Amino acid sequence: MDYESIDRLKQVLNCKVKKTRNDIRHELHNKAYNDSLQTEIRTLEWVLGYIVQKKVHIAKLEVIVQDKIADLKVRMDKAMHREVTDFLFTKIETLRWVLYVIHSINKGSLIVI
């Protein structure tokens, strides 16, 4: 069951990365928006890399993501520049979305649109 959950999570994250890459249109969006999308992609790829490299169980991954969010919140509280807080906020929100997906997979209620 756990391998199925991890495989499902990887599938959802890969789909989100692909969709986000397709959303980047340099002609249509401003630089700040594209930077935000790039940060989202890098964060999702970090989670995917962690899954593949460490071969963690989904419960362990949930704890790791929660710890990373807590660490980023501390860093955001100490940040002195708007660019840094925007960057950290995007990472935190992306990781919160990953937690939502993990919880949905664990409950068996994941709906992908």
Range-by-range predicted roles:
Residues D2-R21, L37-E40, K54-K73:
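Short amphipathic alpha-helical heptad-repeat segments
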Residues M1-E4, K54-I58, Y100-I113:
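Short intrinsically disordered terminal tails
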Residues K60-L99:
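Charged low-complexity stretches with an acidic bias
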Residues A32, S36-T39, T43-W46, Y50, ...:
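Alpha-helical oligomerization interfaces
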Residues M1, R25-H26, W46-V52:
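Short, charged, low-complexity loops and linkers
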